[in-house]
Amino acid sequence: MATAVLFDLDNTLYPYPPCNQAGKAAALERAQELGYDFDHESFAEFYQAGRREVKRDTGGTAASHERYLYFKRALELHTGSPRPGDALALGDAYWSAYLEEMSLVPDAKETLEELQEQGVDIAITTNLTTTIQLAKLERLGLTDYVDLVLTSEETGQEKPASVMFTLPLARLDSRASEAVMVGDDLEADIAGANAVGLETVLFDPSEESDATESADRAATERQADHSIDTLGELTDLVS
């Protein structure tokens, strides 16, 4: 039986796409209120321009996901001058709507409760900045079930870097051979955890048909020790 389970957060314990969509819609609305002449298409181009530059400059760090940076850089490119107040306003609008849209995937809380009752330590290991990841956990109501939270901002490296797995194990006094990693990302979560000896579980609730799955993805999925499409399946694997 596992002594510790490490979970990814984004798109594992809650669905990411609807939250991101809600955040962008709110940021567009706020930009229009501030007097920017954006429609959906032009705002998408504006957002992607900022995102692209930030990822180019900060790739491999928690900052590469920071929406305030995306909006800051996008506004600089769009206006030719710093607009700190507007960048804050767009970032605030994005994250407020994002958090409001969040909801747990089915069986998430029940699974965490059962693991907790079995005496299994639960850690979150996640690629993003600490402030927003803590806000997400609060919003989802998961703080009572989690023994440890580690963000890539704390380590200065992102999954699949080994420190994102070895550090939580060290803090929980657990060995890799006794731990399980659960996540949706084949490279960051599965390959990274495999490299340090954890048992790996790919969480893929999409249930895409064989007709739409590429041979490359099917081959890559074999990197995971297990693949599940509901979190409720996890407790049988761990016990």
Curated annotation (Swiss-Prot):
Region (Disordered) spans which residues?
205-239
Which BP terms does GO give this entry?
small molecule biosynthetic process
Q: Which UniProt keywords apply?
A: Carbohydrate metabolism, Cobalt, Hydrolase, Magnesium, Manganese, Metal-binding, Nickel
Does the keyword section mention Secreted?
Answer: no
For the ligand (Mg(2+)), the binding residues are 8, 10, 184
**Which molecular function GO terms apply here?**
metal ion binding; phosphatase activity
Give the record's cofactor note, including how many are bound: The cation specificity is broad, with similar levels of activity detected in the presence of 1 mM Mg(2+), Mn(2+), Co(2+) and Ni(2+).
The EC number(s) attached to this protein equal: 3.1.3.109
Q: Which portions of the chain have biased composition (kind: Basic and acidic residues)? A: 214-228
Activity's sensitivity to pH is recorded as: Optimum pH is around 6.
- Gene3D superfamilies to which the protein is assigned, alphabetical: 1.10.150.520, HAD superfamily/HAD-like (3.40.50.1000)
Cofactor(s) the protein needs: Mg(2+); Mn(2+); Co(2+); Ni(2+)
Catalytic activity annotated for this protein? D-ribulose 1,5-bisphosphate + H2O = D-ribulose 1-phosphate + phosphate
In this protein, the active site sits at 8 (nucleophile), 10 (proton donor)
Its EC top class is hydrolase
Listed Pfam families: Hydrolase
Q: How is its activity regulated?
A: Requires both monovalent and divalent ions for optimal activity. Optimal KCl concentration is higher than 2.5 M.
Q: Which PANTHER family match?
A: GLYCERALDEHYDE 3-PHOSPHATE PHOSPHATASE, N-ACYLNEURAMINATE-9-PHOSPHATASE
UniProt cross-references to NCBIfam families, sorted A to Z = HAD-SF-IA-v1
Q: What is this protein called?
A: Ribulose-1,5-bisphosphate 5-phosphatase
Q: Which organism is it from?
A: Halopiger xanaduensis (strain DSM 18323 / JCM 14033 / SH-6)
